[in-house]
Design a protein with these regions (language model features):
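Expand to "…catalyze enediolate/carbanion chemistry for C-C bond making/breaking, isomerization
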Residues: 1-346
Length: 346
């Protein structure tokens, strides 16, 4: 099945509110297009230092009640840093406790600020040991990494190649820490776009078969003439740019962003109809012994067929996990065609 991560929504696992698990609970009980593919209970930057322990407690307390009904995957972001042993020690403790107490409700963990490949291997070893101590099957917990340091960027290819025989399932770009580590400056209020890095991330993750996720967009709201309004256009521009260069999903900081990114990273009605028309025609041609066929002026052969098939397989994956989203987004006849068409690979 196609691995879905259109949305990577971080939610502080503890905040200074009467209900400190407010945002965690909101993510776990989200519905419709506001449900992320990956929910990331955040123990790291999103949670104040004084509330880290409470953040872990909240995850342990809330997951048994809410995780069974949550449609997406759950991967907490723990503390970690390639250049700080204390952070790695705390992260190890967090992984071990969560795997032991709620491991059956987790799909994996997110490790921030990893360094070179040796540090990635260390993080993978922490997960493997936590699985053993918790009595979980080997490989039950996946690992996602946040690419936000110069050493990790230098070893990007090696890290992605490590994924081919490991539990590594996703790489996420962290532009704020990366810019700071490189000494970058936000001149004129504009941050770097890092197009070269994103294109490399898209290429290397595609070659390794892991998902690539873009960085956060923190300009959530604008204010004008005393009115504050959600910056939907700015976020959509970033997500659409990521989608055009093959980034699989986008970082979300807010349910409104999740709803936008879920839709943008979803084949449009026109894309799906076009893919189905060409798949159906090519299937007929193959049955008649023809290796290629012209459909709507385009030559469709095995290579282009796979591109159209990927569109259909993504829709099927979304429908498997989020049927309310596909039911709202596509008309019934088109969705039925997508679910029933034969997808043939040589």
């Amino acid at each position: 099945m196609t691995r879905l991560c259109r949305t990577f929504q971080t939610a502080p696992a503890a905040v200074p509110r009467e209900n400190s698990a407010k945002f965690l609970e909101s993510g776990l009980t989200s519905e419709g297009f506001q449900t992320p593919d990956w929910l990331v209970p955040d123990i790291e930057d999103g949670t104040a230092p004084s509330m880290k322990a409470e953040a872990v407690d909240n995850i342990v307390d809330r997951l048994p009640d809410h995780a069974p009904d949550f449609a997406g995957e759950i991967l907490p972001r723990v503390e970690w840093a390639y250049d700080d042993a204390e952070f790695r020690e705390r992260g190890t403790e967090q992984v071990t406790r969560l795997a032991t107490e709620v491991g059956e409700h987790l799909d994996g963990f997110v490790f921030p600020k990893v360094g070179r490949i040796e540090d990635v291997r260390e993080a993978a070893g922490v997960l493997a040991e936590a699985e053993r101590e918790a009595g979980l099957d080997d490989g039950a917990l996946d690992m996602a990494l946040i690419l936000e340091t110069a050493p990790a960027r230098s070893d990007l290819r090696e890290i992605c190649q490590f994924a081919t025989d490991s539990r590594l399932s996703g790489l996420v770009f962290g532009p704020v820490d990366y810019t700071a580590e490189l000494g970058g400056r936000a001149l004129h209020g504009e941050r770097p776009r890092w197009d070269g890095l994103l294109e490399a991330l898209s290429n290397e993750t595609s070659a390794a078969g892991v998902v690539a996720i873009g960085g956060p967009f923190d300009q959530l709201f604008h204010e004008r003439a005393g009115v504050t309004y959600y910056n939907a256009e700015g976020y959509a521009d970033q997500v659409e740019h990521e989608a055009t260069i093959g980034i699989d999903g986008s970082w979300s900081l807010h349910p409104k962003q999740t709803a936008q990114a879920n839709r943008i990273h979803m084949p449009t009605t026109e894309e799906l109809d076009r893919a189905l028309t060409k798949i159906e025609a090519f299937n007929d041609a193959k049955r008649e012994g023809t290796g290629a066929v012209v459909v709507q002026g385009q030559m469709v052969d095995e290579a282009t067929y796979k591109n159209f098939a990927n569109t259909v397989l993504q829709v099927r994956a979304i429908d498997e996990t989020h049927p309310s989203q596909t039911g709202e987004f596509y008309d019934a006849d088109l969705l039925e065609r997508a679910l029933s068409v034969e997808v043939i690979f040589n």
